Amino acid sequence: MKVINVHQRIIHQPKSAVVELFNTLASKNDLMLATHKWPAMKLDNGLTVGSKGGHGPIRYTVEAYSSGEFVQFRFSKPRGFHGFHRFDIVALDTHTTEIRHILDMHTSGFALLTWPLAIRWLHDALIDDAFDKTENHFLSQKKTTRWSAWVKFLRWLS
């Protein structure tokens, strides 16, 4: 099954401010991912091409990286995930930046069931939480995207 999953968020800050957060991805002081809610992203050599790691049961390798622009990860697990996911940081103008997460893959085997029934929902909630955390770094009134009942149920199961 072909899967393309895209999340975008407009941040009303210059790209340089957002890049400061982006550069902490997968570090002990990760300012992008909501590590208080989700497993932390860990990479054996940080944001460098060839670095291996993941978060929770999802494993991947840094396939491409351009500091301050994007990082792309190639899936290695779970079995049946054939493709990549990436974060992009795009300046829309001098004071507005778009952060984007793209997942592009084909699923096979058991992943034909696990992606649409569970992983997709958890993935979407994780990215929403990450984008909330990133945006909240710049806001006085914090934003919180609510989890669906299905996400709450899946998290309760685990």
Question: Which residue ranges define each predicted feature?
Answer:
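Beta-strand/loop substructures that line and gate deep hydrophobic ligand-binding cavities in soluble
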Residues: 77-136, 140, 145-149
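Short beta-strand segments that buttress and anchor functional surface loops
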Residues: 46-54, 72-78
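Hydrophobic pocket/interface hotspot
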Residues: 18-28, 62, 71-73, 99-101, ...
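Short, surface-exposed coil-to-beta transition loops
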Residues: 4-6, 55-60, 81-86
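A short, structured loop/turn motif at beta-sheet edges
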Residues: 12-16, 63-68, 88-98
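A short, hydrophobic/aromatic-rich structural module that often spans a beta strand
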Residues: 146-158
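Hydrophobic ligand-binding cavity/cleft-lining segments
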Residues: 1-43, 155-158
